[in-house]
Amino acid sequence: MLAKRIIPCLDVRDGQVVKGVQFRNHEIIGDIVPLAQRYAEEGADELVFYDITASSDGRVVDKSWVARVAEVIDIPFCVAGGIKSAEDAARILEFGADKVSINSPALANPQLITDLADKFGVQCIVVGIDSYYDKETGKYQVYQFTGDEERTKATQWETRDWVQEVQKRGAGEIVLNMMNQDGVRNGYDIKQLNMVREVCNVPLIASGGAGAMEHFAEAYQKANVDGALAASVFHKQVINIGELKQYLKQQGIEVRL
């Protein structure tokens, strides 16, 4: 059985790591490179970096910090932010990233997923999906440009349909960002994860809501996700990754120690 992955997520804005709650009111956490080093040393399996305003600003990730991160860590990392073409992706991979993740650009141009998968292989193409539960309609809706509070908006896609669409087009992995849970630390949305898992045949990463070690165990045991991504609990040192892995192992969950 493949080991379950623990993935710290670093939201980057203006060259620094920031963290919001439900995608709003971001505070500065610190510099990118020391945080990346700390997580690698603690035992993270992978890191994800989101340049959260690149898409809404119409630019690509600042590649200088990608190269700096690649120099100091020896675990795989994925970079997202404003990647609109194979050239954009190639540059980020050349600077040392192992995977690229696309979100808003894939919604604007779904063919981009196929182009990137054909050129670089599905294993390094991740699609991020920002999913919002609308209590009034009872539906899970995909949102776009979520890094910018002024520009964020609902798309015409329901989450389950978009999950199926991106797989058809060549997504090698899906990160499901559950917006209602983001930064709230009261657990992953297990119901939503199960709904997506039913139609997701590629690795599925849960994102949004981790607040305690039990929340990670729940996502693995109750929704069979392949990885769990979290930010604030790691940034604020609420949870140590090494201790989390020991806990998961005690719960009978396969992890890399």
Curated annotation (Swiss-Prot):
GO terms for biological process: L-histidine biosynthetic process. Its main location: cytoplasm. Belongs to the HisA/HisF family. It is found in: Cytoplasm. It catalyses: 5-[(5-phospho-1-deoxy-D-ribulos-1-ylimino)methylamino]-1-(5-phospho-beta-D-ribosyl)imidazole-4-carboxamide + L-glutamine = D-erythro-1-(imidazol-4-yl)glycerol 3-phosphate + 5-amino-1-(5-phospho-beta-D-ribosyl)imidazole-4-carboxamide + L-glutamate + H(+). Keywords: Amino-acid biosynthesis, Cytoplasm, Histidine biosynthesis, Lyase. The lineage of its organism: Bacteria, Pseudomonadati, Pseudomonadota, Gammaproteobacteria, Vibrionales. IGPS catalyzes the conversion of PRFAR and glutamine to IGP, AICAR and glutamate. The HisF subunit catalyzes the cyclization activity that produces IGP and AICAR from PRFAR using the ammonia provided by the HisH subunit. InterPro entries: Aldolase_TIM, His_biosynth, HisF, IGPS_HisA/HisF, RibuloseP-bd_barrel. The active site is at D11, D130. Its EC number is 4.3.2.10. Signal peptide: none annotated. Pathway: Amino-acid biosynthesis; L-histidine biosynthesis; L-histidine from 5-phospho-alpha-D-ribose 1-diphosphate: step 5/9. Heterodimer of HisH and HisF. It comes from Vibrio campbellii (strain ATCC BAA-1116). One of its GO terms (molecular function) is imidazoleglycerol-phosphate synthase activity. Pfam families: His_biosynth. This is Imidazole glycerol phosphate synthase subunit HisF. GO terms for cellular component: cytoplasm.
